[in-house]
Curated annotation (Swiss-Prot):
Residues 53-79 are annotated as: Disordered. One of its GO terms (molecular function) is molybdate ion binding. It holds the Pfam family SBP_bac_11. Residues 1-44 form the signal peptide. This is Uncharacterized solute-binding protein SSO1031. The lineage of its organism: Archaea, Thermoproteota, Thermoprotei, Sulfolobales, Sulfolobaceae. It comes from the Archaea. GO terms for biological process: molybdate ion transport. Belongs to the bacterial solute-binding protein 1 family. WtpA subfamily. InterPro entries: ModA/WtpA. It comes from Saccharolobus solfataricus (strain ATCC 35092 / DSM 1617 / JCM 11322 / P2). CDD domains: PBP2_ModA_WtpA. Keywords: Signal.
Amino acid sequence: MLEKNLLPEILLAIHMPLNKGLTRVKAIVIIIVVIIAVIAGVVGYYLINHPSNSVTTSSSSTTTSSSLSSTSISSSTTNITSSQGITVFVAGAYLAILNYLADQFQNATEIPVHVVGSGSFALASQIASQTPVPANVFIPVAYIQAVELTGSRNPGWAIAFLSDQMTIVYSNYTTKSPYWSQLYSNYTMAMETNNTKYWYNFFYLLTTRFSLGIANPNTDPEGLYAYLILQMASYLYANHNISYFVHLVKANPNVKVAPSTANYVAPLKAGTLDFTFSYVSYAVSQGLEYLKLPPWLSFGYYPNETTWYSQFAYNISVNGQTLTIHGNPVYLYITIPLNASNIQTAYQFIGFVLGHESQLTRFNVIPIQPALLYNETSNIPQPILNLLKSGELKYAGNFSEV
């Protein structure tokens, strides 16, 4: 150690003979210098080998902080893994409803739900083509064929749990059109009297004097419904010429085509688009105005009208397939794609949705109670069979019966 190494030098300086020109004073000075060096060495050695309390506290604090940060990251990762979040693909018009349900579900279970909205047919195409399966739950609207379009991921079953109806949506800007008063007066008289003349005038003005948003029927059922409504109106009010108003729309340069009706909200609110065909619930959720359609044109849940709806059809093309889709009521379906991950949480979410249908009337949809189970295979999962046995579901038949 340092102090032991210097000890002989101190002793040597004390007993050094006073010769060779050294005086006693010089000897004392040397001794003092050596002693100071020894003391400094001792203090330095002690500080190096015995850190002060303040240094220890600081070091301890830094270590503790680092440990907490590491624990937080680990905990966060664990929570994400254990919470088993799910992704829900939903028809774009029902984003508001599903975001509401997702928040309620997460509050009740602490399981996060990621909601993705788009046209039902487009979402089905994604489920069919992407690997791994991109959605844990699929909620298409209107046509059960959207479930069949998931290809090898088609689960063979779907539950209809909400009903809606078509309408013609507009904003306050639309009422400033020079043709608005004429259109609205004919609409009012048509709804009151069901006179063919007023209905003809209404649809003629709608299809020729206004800008219209009609979603691509190959990606969004709302576009498909729009053309079916025009077919029915043509048959009823234009001398049974089923294509009359369809041709007028296709000749109108102010018809805007988009992948989803969701694309029309901003133009409607900005006044750059006059009308679009959509669901009542969508108009309400977006704070837009709408013209209600009579039961025979609305595709609502009217049992006496279902045969009438089915007499009209429109061809669409999805994934290279041409499909003829017949009219049927606007139902919102829920299912789990085949080979989807995290299916236990997906079943839990379905049970939650079916248990909270009554809360959704605020969105102007009609809960179907009990919900209707459709299938095209005998392989109905046990959790769904349990819901059927408990009475929460009612068997409604094969896909072909929708």
